[in-house]
UniProtKB/Swiss-Prot annotation:
Source organism (scientific name): Bradyrhizobium sp. (strain ORS 278)
Enzyme Commission identifier(s): 2.5.1.19
Subcellular location: Cytoplasm
CDD domains on file: EPSP_synthase (cd01556)
Key words, A-Z: Amino-acid biosynthesis, Aromatic amino acid biosynthesis, Cytoplasm, Transferase
Protein's recorded name: 3-phosphoshikimate 1-carboxyvinyltransferase
Residues of the signal peptide: none
Role, per record: Catalyzes the transfer of the enolpyruvyl moiety of phosphoenolpyruvate (PEP) to the 5-hydroxyl of shikimate-3-phosphate (S3P) to produce enolpyruvyl shikimate-3-phosphate and inorganic phosphate.
Length: 445
C-alpha cells in the first residue's frame, strides 16, 4: 500500500498581478490512456508531453508489471512497446495505484479482458473509494473478484475473463471511468461492446481508440447522451501521442489570474475538448475575460492558447448537466464564486462525494474556515459571493491535491493569508504547481 511523507503545510498570501506565459502539465486523462493503449498495441508508441505526476507514473509502473516495455526517453517523453490486445502477462507484484482512481479503474478494465489474475491496491484515500460501479459491468463480461475489502473496495484481486463476453451496458451515472473500463475490456471480446450514457462524459478513450486503429462508432442517445459501439479484437497499432496541457490543472492559474487584480496571464497548449471545458463556459458566464487563439489539434484532441485577465465576476447558476464536463473543477470554481458579487448555485454535485475525498463537504469547509458563506442543499452547493474573501483559515486537505491547490489560489487575493495543512499530494497531478505559480507572481511561503 502507498504511504505518504510527513505533512508539508504552506501559506498563500495576497499577491501582485500574475503575468507571463506558463504551460501547465500534460493532461492526466490523456496520459493514463496513452500508456494503457500503448501497452495494448502492437509496436511502439511515442508519447510527448506526458504528465509525470505520481498518478500517471503509477500507471506506467503497472504497465511494466503487466509485461509492456515502458521507458522514459527525455523530459516528458516516453516510449511504450506493447503486448497487444489480451496480451498482458500474469503480474508478479501488486498493482499499486497510489491516489489514482482513474489509473486503477481503467487498468481494471484492461485486465478484465485478459486470462490473468491481478491484485489492485492504493493509498488510504483510494482504499476508501467505491469500485463496485466498475466491477459490476466487468463481471457481466466474465471477470471475477476473488478477494476484496468490505464493499468491493481495495485491496482486491481481479480474475480476468478467459473468454470475455461483449455486452450492451447503460451506465448508471455519467462516468468516463465506467465507460472506459467497459470499452477496454471489450477490446478482447468478440463482437460489439456497446456503452450507453444518458449524459455524455469525456470522450478521450473513444478518440484515442480511433487513433490506435480501433473500430468505434459514437451516435447520439436522447437529448444529452451517447451510444458508443466498439468492435472487439482489433489489432491496435502503436501511434504517436502529443499530450495537450491539462484543462483541470490549467483551472488553478486561470482562476488565480481572474481574482488577482491587474493579472494578465497566458496559458499555452491547453486542451479545449468541449467535454472538458465546462469551467471555461461557466467562468465566461460569470464575466471572465478568457481569450483563445493558436487553435490546433492532435489525435482528435483540440488545444489552444488562453489569455486570462483579471475580471469582475458575478454569481450564476450552473446546471447539473454541465457536471460531467467540469467534475474536477468545482472546487476552484467555488473559489471564483467566493470572489464574485452575488450568489452562485452549483447543482447536481453528487459525484463529488466519491472523489479523493468528499469534495462537496471539503469545499464547503474550505470556504467557511476562510469567512465565506456557503450552504449545501442535497447535492447543490450555494456560495454567497461578496467580492472578497476574509481568509485567515487553516484548510484541511484530506489527502486531496485539488483541495490543496484551490485553497492556495484562494489565498492569493484574500484579506488574510490562507494556510493548507499539507501540499504533498499536489504531486499526484501537478508536481510543479508551486514553482510555476511563484514564477507567475504568486506569494507562497
Amino acid at each position: 500500500m502507498s504511504t505518504s511523507a510527513a505533512p508539508t503545510p504552506l501559506e498563500s498570501r495576497a499577491s501582485g498581478p500574475l503575468s507571463g506565459t506558463i504551460r501547465v502539465p500534460g493532461d492526466k486523462s490523456i496520459s493514463h490512456r496513452a500508456l494503457i493503449l500503448g501497452a495494448l498495441s502492437v509496436g511502439g508508441t511515442r508519447i510527448s508531453g506526458l504528465l509525470e505526476g505520481e498518478d500517471v507514473l503509477n500507471t506506467a509502473k503497472s504497465m511494466r508489471t503487466l509485461g509492456a516495455k515502458v521507458e522514459r526517453t527525455g523530459e516528458f517523453a516516453w516510449t511504450v512497446n506493447g503486448v497487444g490486445v489480451g496480451g498482458f502477462a500474469q503480474p508478479a507484484a501488486t498493482l499499486d495505484f497510489g491516489n489514482s482512481g482513474t489509473g486503477c479503474r481503467l487498468v481494471m478494465g484492461a485486465v478484465a479482458g485478459c486470462p490473468i489474475s491481478a491484485v489492485f491496491d492504493g493509498d488510504a484515500s483510494l482504499r476508501s473509494r467505491p469500485m463496485r460501479r466498475i466491477l459490476d459491468p466487468l463481471a457481466l463480461m466474465g471477470a471475477k473478484v476473488t478477494a476484496s475489502a468490505e464493499g468491493g473496495k481495495l485491496p482486491l484481486t481481479l480474475q480476468g475473463a478467459s473468454n470475455p463476453v461483449p455486452i450492451e451496458y447503460r451506465t448508471p451515472v455519467a462516468s468516463a471511468q465506467i465507460k472506459s473500463a467497459v470499452l477496454l475490456a471489450g477490446l478482447a471480446a468478440p463482437g460489439v461492446t456497446t456503452v450507453i450514457e444518458q449524459e455524455a462524459s469525456r470522450d478521450h478513450t473513444e478518440l484515442m481508440l480511433k487513433h490506435f486503429g480501433a473500430e468505434i462508432v459514437t451516435t447520439p442517445e436522447g437529448s444529452h447522451g451517447r451510444r458508443i459501439a466498439l468492435t472487439g479484437q482489433p489489432e491496435l497499432r502503436g501511434a504517436p501521442v502529443i499530450v495537450p496541457a491539462d484543462p483541470s490543472s490549467a483551472a488553478f492559474p486561470l482562476v488565480a489570474a481572474l481574482i488577482v487584480d491587474g493579472s494578465d496571464l497566458v496559458l499555452s497548449d491547453v486542451m479545449t475538448n468541449p467535454l472538458r471545458t465546462g469551467l471555461f463556459t461557466t467562468l465566461r458566464e460569470m464575466g471572465a475575460s478568457i481569450e483563445e487563439d493558436d487553435v490546433r489539434g492532435d489525435a482528435g484532441e483540440p488545444m489552444a492558447r488562453l489569455r486570462v485577465r483579471a475580471s469582475k465576476l458575478k454569481g450564476v447558476e450552473v446546471p447539473p448537466e454541465r457536471a460531467p464536463s467540469m467534475i474536477d473543477e468545482y472546487l476552484v470554481l467555488a473559489v471564483a464564486a467566493a470572489y464574485a458579487e452575488g450568489t452562485t448555485i452549483m447543482r447536481g454535485l453528487h459525484e463529488l462525494r466519491v472523489k479523493e475525498s468528499d469534495r462537496l463537504e471539503a469545499t464547503a469547509a474550505m470556504l467557511r474556515v476562510n469567512g465565506v458563506k456557503v450552504e449545501i442543499t442535497g447535492d447543490d452547493l450555494i456560495v454567497e459571493g461578496r467580492g472578497h474573501v476574509p481568509g485567515g483559515g487553516l484548510v484541511a486537505t484530506h489527502m486531496d491535491h485539488r483541495i490543496a491547490m484551490s485553497a492556495l489560489v484562494m489565498g492569493l487575493a484574500s484579506d488574510k493569508p490562507v494556510t493548507v495543512d499539507d501540499t504533498a499530494f499536489i504531486a499526484t497531478s501537478f508536481p510543479d504547481f508551486i514553482p510555476l505559480m511563484r514564477k507567475a507572481g504568486a506569494d507562497f511561503a
